[in-house]
Amino acid sequence: MSKQHARTSAGSNRKFKPFKITMMSTIAALFFGSSVLVSTVKADDSGMAELKKVLQGQIALMKPELQEKVKGLSTDTKMLLMSILAMHSHYSDKATLRQVMLEVLADYQSMVMGIMTDSSEMTADAARRLANHRIPIGGLLPYMGMENITDDRLAVLAGFNDSVEGNSIKLAEAADKGDMVTAASLLGDISSGCVGCHAVFRPEIPGTSDLLR
């Protein structure tokens, strides 16, 4: 893991402002192997510049065979992956996916505790933390296994993202209004999304990767 740490971009557990993505095809090309469009990113767009650094660091950490597999994905898949990543503002150069998933579990449990104790603030805060969970070192793809880096396989991420992150935001909004009944009703949808994603992508040894340098 020390080599992974040394090769990633500087700074650990960095927190960035949410990114407004207006040219998804440009960003996808930037992330997934085309240097031609790098110059189209405006220099004064600090959010875009930070995202560029993060994504270049993720690509650099991938072993060559994974880099080639990722570059071969369709534009639609690349744009989907970028749209998911752009929803997050916490990127780590230390945490593995296993560690991130433990954080997600803790946030889920905090949501349940908040609902059971009728604490709208605890519930909403935990739900928003879950929705904006940390992205692990190297990004998400290295932990999914080479066999899953295909257009068909990755297409299901959209539904899982809506089930987990999307419903977590809805749960937070319901808690903000004091509507704990609606908040509670969303727990099942969130957990179903988690279980479904695990069924598709979780490897034999969860949360680790042999596809990082």
Mark where each language-model region is.
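Cleavable N-terminal export/targeting peptides
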Residues: 2-3, 26, 39
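Sec/Tat signal peptide C-region and signal peptidase I cleavage site
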Residues: 36-43
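Sequence context surrounding c-type heme c attachment/ligation sites in exported
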Residues: 44-213
